[in-house]
Amino acid sequence: KNPALIKKHKNNYLELGQSAAKDFLASIKKVLIKDSKIHFDRFTSEDRHIHKKSFTKKALAIFEKSGLMYKKDGALWFKTTQFGDDKDRVFVTKDGFPTYFLADAGHYLETKKRGFDQKINIFGPDHYGYVKRIQAAAEIMGVKNSKIIITQAVRLIKRGQEVKMSKRKGEFVAFGDLVAEVGVDVARFFFLMHSPETHMDFDLELAKERSMKNPVYYVQYAAVRCSGILNKANRKSQIAKRKIDFSLLNTTEDINLMRMLARFSEIVDEAAKNYNPQILVRYSMDLAREFNNFYEKERVI
């Protein structure tokens, strides 16, 4: 709380803050949904869906029944050290305001009430210290299947040099600007090539290059070749499937491509079970490599 701001704006400071947050969220949604073509089933408002529906109060009541709460310096604390945390955490400040920790516990309850038995939390690289308390909240709220993903920083490489950024100084490149420069397909593909839990270098020059060095162009080129074969086959081929001699598919390139294609269902299943689209992206690159090898050494039509 900033006393000077409260005095200046009197009772309007909360409304002003909410209005600014609403505008900021709208700009983020535009980048994510319209510009980046990312679909969200639902957006949750912490104010409307968590606080105003009393999920923080319900979470607090559950914590109080756990016997792991205590008062200190006018604040309400939770014994997160019993869950491996390095220190206990404040739940409610001495001014009576709930902390992010309590709000996150409320999120668990709200998710559980909507019928979900699993919650995946995605944090930035500066939130390692938050893991133990979130795991504690999940356990107390009765959500047994809780996963935490710590994303890593992305370095932007331009002309072989790292573009220096600083959150403290407000120096950064927004994802929307990146999409505008390289295109949405390339931006999405480059990010999905890497696990969110590993560091990533985004090579701006490579992303804009239209050659086989660019993995996006490489995969798209294979797709165009596939389409060309299928189009010609539909126009010219009158051979019935039952008359095809599959024994002719016996070269190294034939066999490698067929083996890769046979893995498709397994790859989709693995990506779904691990919540990891990177597996599909890597597979598309491997499949493109095998297909291009096949295409360059075998006359198809």
Predicted segments, located by residue:
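Non-catalytic interaction-recognition regions
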Residues: 1-301
